[in-house]
A protein has these predicted regions:
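Short acidic/histidine-rich active-site segments
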Residues: 130
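Radical SAM [4Fe-4S] cluster-binding motif and immediate context
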Residues: 1-127, 135
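Flexible glycine/acidic-rich beta-alpha junction loops that bind and position SAM and/or redox cofactors
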Residues: 42, 99, 103-104, 133-141, ...
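Short, well-ordered amphipathic alpha-helices
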Residues: 17, 47-49, 146-158
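Catalytic cores of alpha/beta
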Residues: 76-77, 136-153
């Protein structure tokens, strides 16, 4: 197994773990802090189905969903996540500037973020988008593009949380990104 596979564990245990937490500690909501949770969408489908099959009265959300991954989610998967009581996820939209997205090698486009956002309209799943500003060479016009993207995402889906724009220095991105 790869290190990521070892870390992600056997999916059959996660719904069981939720059930244990519900029974033992009366947990009503679980927050999963895993940037790689959504990498394997088949695994995510199995987890959501396992939670649904157990009919647990537990909602859950995930810190960590790459914008590429949310763009690949099918409507069927999104509906399954919603039925399994997934209430949200955090994803980095980063910038409204195509040039900046290319510069930081994010492997997403602005349109990809816009299209993925629309998929969650009408569900109980609340995407939280994070943004970063003040990249080296970023112009005021590019910063305005990011602000405009925030407003566009909110216009298209009133059920989102547009995170604040975090300055590049605080984001902890290394200079190696730009070499």
């Amino acid at each position: 197994k790869t290190p990521a596979e070892k870390r992600s564990g056997d999916i059959k245990y996660l719904p069981k773990d939720f059930e244990y937490l519900k029974e033992r500690f009366k947990v009503g909501h679980i927050y999963i802090n895993d940037d790689n949770f959504f990498v394997n969408l088949l695994r995510v489908k199995d987890i959501a189905q396992g939670l649904l099959d157990r009919n647990l009265d537990i909602s859950w959300e995930v810190l960590g969903a790459h914008a590429q991954t949310t763009a690949r989610m099918t409507n069927d998967l999104i509906q399954l996540l919603d039925k399994s009581r997934c209430t949200g996820f955090l994803t980095g939209a980063e910038s409204g500037s195509p040039r900046i997205l290319e510069l930081i090698k994010k492997n997403i486009t602005v349109q990809m973020v816009i299209d993925a956002n629309k998929k969650f309209v009408g569900t109980g799943i609340v995407p939280t988008y994070t943004f970063i500003s003040s990249y080296p060479t970023e112009t005021n016009d590019e910063l305005k593009m990011t602000v405009n993207l925030m407003f566009r995402l909110l216009k298209d889906n009133k059920n989102i949380i547009p995170g604040n724009i975090k300055p590049f220095i605080e984001a902890g991105i290394g200079a190696s990104v730009f070499s």
